Amino acid sequence: MSKAVGIDLGTTYSCVAHFVNDRVEIIANDQGNRTTPSFVAFTDTERLIGDAAKNQAAMNPANTVFDAKRLIGRKFDDPEVQNDIKHFPFKVVEKGGKPHIQVEFKGETKVFTPEEISSMVLTKMKETAESYMGGKVTDAVITVPAYFNDSQRQATKDAGLIAGLNVLRIINEPTAAAIAYGLDKKEQGKGEQNILIFDLGGGTFDVSLLSIDEGIFEVKATAGDTHLGGEDFDNRLVNHFANEFKRKYKKDLTTNQRALRRLRTACERAKRTLSSSAQTSVEIDSLYEGIDFYTSITRARFEELCQDLFRSTLDPVEKVMRDGKLDKSQVAEIVLVGGSTRIPKIQKLVSDFFNGKEPNKSINPDEAVAYGAAVQAAILTGDTSSKTQDLLLLDVAPLSLGIETAGGVMTKLIPRNTTIPTKKSEIFSTYSDNQPGVLIQVYEGERAKTKDNNLLGKFELSGIPPAPRGVPQIEVTFDIDANGILNVSAVEKGTGKSQKITITNDKGRLSKEEIDRMVAEAEKYKEEDEKEAARIAAKNGLESYAYSLKQTASEKQFEEKVDASKRESLNKAIEETISWLDNNQSATTDEYEDKRKELEGIANDALKDLYAAGGVPGGAAPGGFPGAGGAAPGADQGPSVEEVD
């Protein structure tokens, strides 16, 4: 029996499970609860984790930390982090561009990273498993939202390491939930089935489209919002009641963190009640300045307060259907995961979207993710149960990955929704003569220009022997491991010089806002992007043509066979074109094309003589690399790598 566990590290609650005797056991904590609040509290005497931390939150708001998952792997100046900080009763400070949490612990000021806070929650889950299983637990599979980016995944893995865990694998929450749904189904021999996992938790939202066939779970597409969940619905209720309190009593309770915490706890309770009742009352004694706050709210009012948030959950559903190229009628089951899917309005929206099809509620929305992670942990540690035999998980990369080539173009090596693990290599070359090195800049995102995407990291490959532009061959390899974490390497074929980089979160990384903006804007800006791509192709085409003509014109037989005046006018035209290009980096497609026609006219006249005399140019045929990269040589902006078709 393996001692490996599956841990669902949630924004608001976490859960741990273990696969034993052909079944999954969800492990209850010391309070007897099967889920544990992702809360850590610091007092004058001790550190509390889980239920104990959450229970004292109102008395100690400034030193009770929660929602670390909303900060992990993000930059401090990320607008979402800034927005969250407004709601947090604890202090978030900036160190090295990243958010850190500042608390008072045992009488001194301490600063923790989000990874450290998450690692404390993981430690609690590890101890919960150890007390149940007897003995040490080190191997774990930890889940993350499918839409978590590279840096958030890496940071989550780091949190596991800090907690003393050997992180076997980072897997996506919806995929783990799909295992929970499909594990019992694989014996039924239903053939291939498309299922949609709709996972709306406390702080994150994911939608994944999978096909399940005889134990093979293949993710077709994934989308989501790493910053939408039950917490946001609670916030709407808190604001609603705070405003009501202000209207009734002319007092602003939002200045008092303790009152806010008590109100938030009451709101969370009211929200849950509204999933089963049409209305509920909120009663808080001595909420603020001795005032008892008694009020009520109906389900309809709650739905209206969160209307835009509820509706926004359908955008990723539409996106995965588009990306997966499936029709609504081809989805066999819609599986709801995450506590927030208990909200009747959410269920109705999903059902209406799929033309009245009822969502499947056969799995426990709070436990499904940990359940699937436990199954994966058992498989990875060599469990031989008949249940887990032949179970194969094929997940995907949520965002396209590529490098910047000349002209600031995003050259994608791995498109979004590519099955992982995956490895892809492409050959690039230098951009100017005798260039000694290239700068490889790695980006993620969906836009055509790298400036609109997210820079993951960069490295220099130097020591390239002097050679004309386009001659050295630089092979760039992207390798995404099964955790969705990227390694990039580059090797110069001639010398065998190589350089590699694991993209970790040295660079504070992407927010859901940016990711979502990228994909949403990518649709909107697709036309602009295409226009820009055509413009750069025209510019690069003209430049390659001018240089290949220049090479032809410098050859001996050209000088021997072509009339001197024609040679002179061609050389003059080439030099003029090259200098015009240097000064007109942002001309239009038409201007580049006109310039090329002009040059072609002069060139054809001279080349006629050459061909008539039987000389064929030994250099590259005029035309160069079609669609090759291009900031003009000598222009120092941007990288100096050129794509070779």
UniProtKB/Swiss-Prot annotation:
List the GO molecular function terms. Answer: ATP binding; ATP-dependent protein folding chaperone
Chief localization: cytoplasm
Tell me which residues bear N-acetylserine.
S2
List the GO terms this entry assigns under cellular component, sorted alphabetically.
cytoplasm
Q: Keywords in alphabetical order, please.
A: Acetylation, ATP-binding, Chaperone, Cytoplasm, Nucleotide-binding, Stress response
The family assignment reads:
Belongs to the heat shock protein 70 family.
**Function description:** Acts as a chaperone.
The entry's protein name is Heat shock protein 70 1
* Gene name tied to this protein: HSA1
